[in-house]
Amino acid sequence: LLEKLKESLGAVLPIIGIVLVLCFSIAPIPNSVLMTFVVGAVLLIIGMMFFTLGAEMAMTPMGERIGTKLTNTRKISVVIVLCFILGFIITISEPDLQVLAEQVPSIPNYTLIIAVATGVGIFLVAAVLRMLFGIPLAHMLLILYPIIFILASIVPQDFLTVAFDSGGVTTGPMTVPFIMALGIG
């Protein structure tokens, strides 16, 4: 619990510090608004602490078990379908992706969420197949980067500007513990 508190503080305190510096220097605000901000920041830290703790407690054991069972199955088609579905669903549940979708007015929310979730599903399949067949990472990158550049040249500009940022939001508190545990399993 203390470790999760430290993680939450590390994520939120810099932002709180910047906001407070701005409030006391160039953008003064009423005391009532400042107190609301401070209370909200404390609740945010506590909420993040419990959320990441719960996500890790739930996702890590589940991911390890699923990963173990997947590697024991001999049907590649089952592995492919399950990995895609797991990557897709776990990404849709990612809170950071929901926030990003709300921040991009030029792309409908569901379009962005589905596109990112599909990408994670596809690349989770690729990662699991790479592990199962012992394919070197360099070979995968030599194949996948040209595909990414070709796709980047044909998608709408509005979509492209958000595409690379979207990769960052998939490394949130839901996706990372699950996918890492899946790989360990």
What is the predicted role of each segment?
Residues 33-35, 69-79, 106-115, 153-155, ...:
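Membrane-interfacial loop-to-helix junctions in multi-pass transporters
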Residues 13-26, 40-50, 82-89, 119-130, ...:
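Hydrophobic core segments of alpha-helical transmembrane domains in multi-pass membrane transport
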Residues 1-13, 74-75:
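N-terminal membrane topogenic signal
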Residues 23-35:
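Short, hydrophobic transmembrane alpha-helix segments
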Residues 56-74, 99-103:
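Flexible loop linkers connecting adjacent transmembrane helices
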Residues 37-49, 106-118, 166-179:
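Structural signature of hydrophobic alpha-helical transmembrane segments
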Residues 44-62:
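Juxtamembrane transmembrane-helix boundary signature
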Residues 76-148:
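Helix-loop-helix junctions within the multi-pass membrane cores of secondary transporters/permeases
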